[in-house]
Amino acid sequence: MGIKYFFRWYKDSFPNTVTKYSTKNHKKSQDTDEPFLLLLDLNGIIHTSCQKIYKYGSFEPKNLLKKSPPVYKGEKDVLVYEDVLASIDSLVALVEPRELVLCIDGVAPVSKQIQQRQRRFITHKTDGGFDSNCISPGTEFLFQLGLYLKTHLESKLEKEWLNVSTIYFMDSLVPGEGEHKLFDFLRTHQTRIVDTKFNIVVVGNDADLIMLSLLVSVLFIKENPLSILREDLTSKKLDYLLVDINLLKDTIYQNASRDKPRFTPYDFEFVICDFVVMCFMIGNDFLPSVPLFNIYDGGLDMLLKYYFTTAGYITCRSVSKFYGRNKGKKMEKIKINFKHLQPYLHYIATAVNPQAIEHYRNRNYGYPNVLLDVVLKKEAMLTEDVTTHYLKAYSPHHKITKSLVHSYLEEIKWIFNYYAYGAVCIDWNMYYPSQFAPTALDLSFATLTFTSQSGLKERKKCLTDPFFQLLCILPPHSSDLLPDPLNKLLVQKLVDGHPIEIKMDYDGKLNEWEAIPILPPLDYNKILKMYNDHIHQCSKEDLKRNTASKQLKISAVTEF
């Protein structure tokens, strides 16, 4: 999902970095003898193929010029798999890579599971009975897709993709989110990628690909061309836009070098990392956005302008022990300096928030905002009684506490480490325990005394089995995606955390689709105990999709 409204803002803010992708320009780039490395996060492709075959979403019959002939039950999943492979095929033909990396979402950190749970509770089966929640690790649907692709990728490499030397495939049994597995691959293969002078192309529409690309290109793979290829959603045809990450880095640097007070030495890495941290604060898949700080009211523009005209960096360097490919080595890393972040949070509270309040006062669209209504009624700024009222509007037991604010700051640090240094360096169990964020003023005060309790530490690669994750994220109407007897647990013994009826939070949203389901917190210890008590009753066949596997490397016979 990424960051709402971000790419629209991005195109307006950095138009020089976005171009229409054409085969002509691609060929011109290939003439430089830089082989292409193509990386695909397949989940977006899988969702599109499912919509196309099962006729929902963008492919509902009402949105089509004519109806397709009926497809009989039992054939449809295979048609989805074929369509996914066809989409991969077309991208390989378009980019002509030397190497290809394909990833499907595996089990995710708990912080991401919370967002996945919200999305799955608001999905509904199609008229034909298709449940898009099956696009989750541990389901029969994704397991069979992985087997299908493994078989057919070998055939494609041998008979059709003659310019491709190697395919790296990570299916849904390999732990980690798809896009993060792609960037873990880049970090792991850094030396070889740099030495080969690969031209890196990442395909996907998620806004957070821009953040991941910026960080990997400024901290690890600094010289290689790196671009994001994404569908042009404004085009009626299947056109692509190319986002030039190297040019984006240069543009951000030029803005800073022109406006920002000089430092000795001037640090390019800090500026890029600071930009990413500021973008995180408008909300993402792991954190609710800071109230009244959003893109559509101009909040991010104001914060960036303040940053580029103010002395100081948000990030700094520290020496830490690394894990993964540099295990045991002590190396410099970038981290957030929360005392340096404090002035920016204070600026949001004192300058950005009043602009949002004024916009809200004058706008005639969108849904009411509880916090803004209280502010306007009291004709006061964001004092403690106002923010407490804001949180109490959702739960009589929900109070803003120092612990909650510190959890939010810990999560910002966690997200930065995850995006900058990968899944091996984060605590997979960490999460922010609320659907609502503290205000900028609360965060500003907290940073003055905040001392992080977490660091860059090695964690187990995966702390969650696929079936356990399904128990945590699936709604009751999708219980059939779990095998016996786990499906019965969901609807009989775990009903407290899996309600059939839910309320939606529309507070301050511009559109209905932005609403967030208000769900009860999960008792993970209770779920884990029941899971451990019943998992041995699952069949051996079902348990095949509840394991962790490793990356598959498929190499061509022909030498390159």
UniProtKB/Swiss-Prot annotation:
Enzyme class, spelled out: hydrolase
Protein family: Belongs to the 5'-3' exonuclease family.
Signal peptide extent: none
EC number(s) per entry: 3.1.11.-
Coiled coil: none
Any single GO BP term: nuclear-transcribed mRNA catabolic process
UniProt source species: Invertebrate iridescent virus 3
Pfam families membership: XRN_M, XRN_N
InterPro entries named in the record: 5_3_exoribonuclease (IPR027073), Xrn1_helical (IPR041412), Xrn1_N (IPR004859)
UniProt keyword terms in alphabetical order: Exonuclease, Hydrolase, Nuclease
Name this protein carries in UniProt: Putative exonuclease 059L
GO terms, molecular function: 5'-3' RNA exonuclease activity; RNA binding
Upper taxonomic lineage: Viruses, Varidnaviria, Bamfordvirae, Nucleocytoviricota, Megaviricetes
